[in-house]
């Protein structure tokens, strides 16, 4: 005899435990599970838990060398999704000892590693995570956070304004720097490298950094305002990424940038630590996110990627506009924006938030609005997202018929008009267009922008929508 019962047993016999009471130290997950025909939801939910904790496909004798009951993940509740056939939300608890401290990489490797390829599942999506306070305290988080950034920039009481330099690829470093200067001189707070601007043959990174630094210091001197350009440090190796961040700091630049999903969480966390130690702000782009989060029944919701970014570290992150060209349903978007900015967020299924999340004073992240927005969107953006956001107009600045600087002027005037109207008690949602028209009477740059983009709409139905609420 081998001393144990060999063979295969159903996952639900071990990992489905509806009587389990969750602990404050557990990582909790909500999965949207779509089982294959004939697979009970309890078995599908338990299978996910097994593969992401202590399980394998058969009983093994080394199970007897540890306490599986202590370390196994547990599926503690399953509920059907209203309006969907054969779709369930499975709630899972993971013991904290399964995860390495301060490692988003390890957390995701465990929770969303192999399980998404299970044959027993037609589809699987991670909808939300509750990260326990004990685990949060092992992370540095954002390099600086919202309040420290405002203090560094000396900018209060309004959203920050940015612009992505276009065309994103093909400009020489000097012409690129010229566009940066014109936008900053016109009134923007930031300009930005696009996510795929790294170090290509037409514009090597060092040349771009030098011309952009010259542009922002010249604009600062002429306006008396602190300016920044998101210098993209993303590179093919972590060593090269850090070399670029070091050079940016040596130039005196206030902010660098990273593509956190394509660059990876290990690289991102390393860069965030360097930024805190050296006084650099860190702008995060979410390139590749829609590959992971776009489909409603498979992948991972962006609210999970947003929480992971806050743990890994970033002072800004792109997070949808609601009104522009990119995906973003209002209630869902505001839910994960609060998860980025606020210190404590209550469970609220009407906004897609499955768990109450306490961030125990981890610094917050500014949500960046970008993608197909222009001056007519300014009232809605100001009203929806409030002051703690970055409004980034690429084509909505550089597409101005009079040039880059007038495009920046138009956006700054529109923003100041909206903030002033809001502070006077006017309703931006109801009076937004009138507020912009009034401001355009004394700003020819804004008037020209209003004329160009008066008929631009992106009216497409969102792919990712909320489930019907349970009674």
Curated annotation (Swiss-Prot):
Record PTM N6-carboxylysine, positions in chain: 192
Cellular compartment(s): Plastid, Chloroplast
EC annotation from Swiss-Prot or TrEMBL: 4.1.1.39
Catalytic activity line of the entry: 2 (2R)-3-phosphoglycerate + 2 H(+) = D-ribulose 1,5-bisphosphate + CO2 + H2O; D-ribulose 1,5-bisphosphate + O2 = 2-phosphoglycolate + (2R)-3-phosphoglycerate + 2 H(+)
Class of the enzyme per the UniProt entry, highest EC level: lyase
Chain sites annotated for binding Mg(2+): 192, 194-195
More info: The basic functional RuBisCO is composed of a large chain homodimer in a 'head-to-tail' conformation. In form I RuBisCO this homodimer is arranged in a barrel-like tetramer with the small subunits forming a tetrameric 'cap' on each end of the 'barrel'.
Protein name as it appears in the record: Ribulose bisphosphate carboxylase large chain
Source species of the chain: Deppea grandiflora
Gene from which this protein is expressed: rbcL
